[in-house]
Amino acid sequence: MTTYIAYGNINQPFSLESLPDELIPENLYQIETDSSRVFQRHQCRRLAHLLLFQLLKIAGKSTALLSQIHRTESGRPYFLDERIDFNISHSGDWVAVILDIRNEEKSAVGIDIEFPKIRNFTALMEHIAPKEEIDWFHHQQDSLNAFYRCWCLREAVLKSQGFGIVKLSNVRHFPEQQKIFSDYCPQGQLWFTDELPIYLAAFVNHQEKLPHFYEWNRESLQIKELEKYVLYEVN
């Protein structure tokens, strides 16, 4: 069993049209729009599709899976082969994809990235976290890092099952013990890192060594050696 993560920025050169036509959904072809936000989100979806294609190749799996993506009632994309799971996240101009391959058991993964920006962190923490976690947050020197750690890990575990941010407060986070508990995700482990241009949290439903990280750089994936991360046990 192996886990792969690729991330990239839509301002880097990339060509989805380099893929075989049958692997490109109609809704991912180029669009014309006057809305910069609509264009940005569309480009993020296009890059995510390309990153998933590249990860399938690296993993030695058939890229034909790209034409066999289904969606749950909540809209979460998945493959019919339960031993292979993937998840996508984007924030601003950044995109990340996680792909997990298991030999026999069912795979479940979730990923969340956030491009940092200043927010009312205290108000958001009061909305999603209990008093003990808020106290921990207020004692951290780097409030930006602390907030996105609390936020990203919640989203990542919930996205493994297709739950949205409405359940964020149902995730119990113990930062000192590096443990996470939730009724809305299976047992597993999670990594959080602030080493990249984005904050990133990734969940897998099994015990796994650090995923293989790749960065999209000038039309190809390049290996990224991650050195700084926090490992959590989940449930």
Curated annotation (Swiss-Prot):
It holds the Pfam family ACPS. Gene3D superfamilies: 4'-phosphopantetheinyl transferase domain. The lineage of its organism: Bacteria, Pseudomonadati, Pseudomonadota, Gammaproteobacteria, Pasteurellales. Signal peptide: none annotated. May transfer the 4'-phosphopantetheine moiety from coenzyme A (CoA) to a serine residue of a carrier protein domain. The keyword Amino-acid biosynthesis does not apply. GO terms for molecular function: holo-[acyl-carrier-protein] synthase activity; magnesium ion binding. GO terms for biological process: lysine biosynthetic process via aminoadipic acid. Its EC number is 2.7.8.-. GO terms for cellular component: cytosol. Mg(2+) binds at D112, E114, E155. Its cofactor is Mg(2+). PANTHER family: L-AMINOADIPATE-SEMIALDEHYDE DEHYDROGENASE-PHOSPHOPANTETHEINYL TRANSFERASE, PHOSPHOPANTETHEINE TRANSFERASE. InterPro entries: 4-PPantetheinyl_Trfase_dom, 4-PPantetheinyl_Trfase_dom_sf, P-Pant_transferase_sf. This is Putative 4'-phosphopantetheinyl transferase HI_0152. It comes from Haemophilus influenzae (strain ATCC 51907 / DSM 11121 / KW20 / Rd). It is an enzyme of class 2 (transferase). Belongs to the P-Pant transferase superfamily. Gsp/Sfp/HetI/AcpT family. Keywords: Magnesium, Metal-binding, Transferase.
